[in-house]
Amino acid sequence: MRTVIQISDCHLSDESSFNRLRKALNTAQNETTCDTLLLTGDLCCNPRASDYQTLLAFLNKHIQNKHVYAIAGNHDDFILMKEEFRDSSIHVVEKAEIHGRQVLFLDSSAKPLDEHHPLGSGRVDNRGVARFKRQLRHATNPIVVVHHPIIPVGSDWMKAICLENDASLLALLAKHRVQDVICGHGHDALTVTKQGVTQHMAPATAYGFDHNIDEYNRSEKIGVNKIFFEDERIKVETIWL
């Protein structure tokens, strides 16, 4: 059975962050069943011009013969990402068919409209929501890929760094009977189900978060998610690096 490897929250900024990403890419390349990579946001930290081209060159050095899709996170510059990945091996798209399943990519990198959400929170903007509604009307049991969790999960401080319009998006998913969401942002492997929607969060490659600790923290626990797209549902296994 073919599989997908999800790589998230690389926070590329220094040599150590690239070394950790290398471990993830080598794991994906050596996984014989994997033919697709999902890069689920926070790829670069405070990105500047050419940073995504550097990531592209790094990925092409370690990954061959695999389809690669990317979305932006709150640390990314979505416009710069699209420009620097254009016509490359990393695809920034709104939807795709992967292993016979419809996959919808949702951009949550917009900043919240209110001032109550702390730095790191996100929002799906009005244009994105309108497009997502159109996609859902024409999709059959799609898989949704987004950076921020739609279902709040983890420690209280992580739940605060949330998606501003998460409640309305969850209601939309439930209305259209979407069963599976793939996300990042939480730097840990967490799975939760609410209103019939199961959300699968991947660990980061940069550093981990221990959600049992009541304040912001970092750990050395990094990894990727290995995802099986089955006929009706998906199955996720975490590979710790």
Tell me what each language-model feature is.
Residues 18-19, 23, 171-175, 190-241:
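Binuclear metal-dependent phosphoesterase catalytic core
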Residues 1-58:
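N-terminal active-site segment of His-dependent metallophosphoesterases
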Residues 12-16, 45-50, 74-81, 111-116, ...:
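Active-site environment of divalent metal-dependent phosphoester hydrolases
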Residues 19-22, 51-56, 88-89, 124-127, ...:
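Charged helix-capping and loop-helix junction motifs
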Residues 69-70, 78-94:
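Glycine/small-residue-rich loop that forms an oxyanion/phosphate-binding "nest" at active or ligand-binding sites
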Residues 27-36, 67, 118-200, 234-235:
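His/acidic metal-ligating clusters that form di-metal
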Residues 2-11, 100-112, 143-145, 197-204, ...:
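Active-site-proximal beta-strand elements of phosphoester/diester hydrolases
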Residues 9, 28, 37, 42, ...:
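Divalent metal-coordination and catalytic microenvironments
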